[in-house]
Amino acid sequence: MKIDSVLKMSKIDYNAARAVFENYLNSYDRKNDKVWLKIVHTYGVVAESTELAKRLRLGEEDASLARIIALLHDIGRFEQLKRYDSFMPDTMDHASFGVHILFREGVIRQFVPEDTWDGIIETAIARHSDFVLEGVTEERVLLHARIIRDADKLDNCRVKLTDDLMTFMGADAGKIGSTAISEKIRKDALEGKSILSADRVTLMDYWVSYLAYFYDLNFRESLDIVEENDYVRRIIHRIPYTEPNTKKTMEELEKRLVRYVHEAKKV
């Protein structure tokens, strides 16, 4: 994939990188609802990364680096949608493919002329969608891996509140709320565990898994953003739960998550 470079400066320059990104998007159908959702999401993650960098009191270079990582974190999604018209993980590992585009095809140089930060950027993007973040030991790399994971989840709160359910769930609110929650999903969520993608079966399993994202947030500052925006209650109450056991579980989960978000101590 060739992108005409508009970068001339040897530093982290977000505005120039954004111009390259906009040019990259010209290869895809912006009118496609799923593509547009991911474009909006990308810039939402940039905004959340910027806010986290501010709250974490990062220096200028790390703040700029966080924004660049956010801009590029889902670059593999667009090719996934072009080929498969799907976000499902069984169609493509979008994080790995994003790394392939950037670092195997050399596209990263179009966004960041210097290779100084390649190791940080590559690891953060490669690991941003891992079920659990493990094996990253270098302090600065770990910082940015945590920031992008949290920023991604924080913007996904906006997605779950405002985007068309048919676009990312394939069903309307009534149908989602009428389905059961699998026992393993119910148990894991109420025990404070993240949900493994492969364990999800029903529509409600998927919905619960999005709420269980909160358990995986790394920073107290991220949980503060969740609490300030009342994301737990607002996301839960977007769906009318008509299946009796589902309704009961969601009431329990709401109480547990509200308490967790308020009390949890993080890095």
Question: For the regions a protein language model found, what residue spans apply to each?
Answer:
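Alpha-helix boundary/interfacial micro-motifs
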Residues: 66, 90-91, 123, 163, ...
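Divalent metal-dependent phosphate-bond-processing catalytic cores, especially two-metal-ion Mg2+/Mn2+ enzymes
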Residues: 2-8, 34-39, 43, 47, ...
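Hydrophobic/aromatic-rich structural module bridging two neighboring secondary-structure elements via a short loop
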Residues: 78-119, 131
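RNase III-family endoribonuclease catalytic core
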Residues: 121-129, 133
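Short low-complexity stretches enriched in small and charged residues
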Residues: 2, 20-27, 78-82, 105-115, ...
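Acidic/His-rich, divalent-metal-binding segments that scaffold phosphate/diphosphate chemistry
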Residues: 1-96, 138
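Alpha-helical scaffolds flanking conserved acidic
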Residues: 58-71, 115-124, 141-147
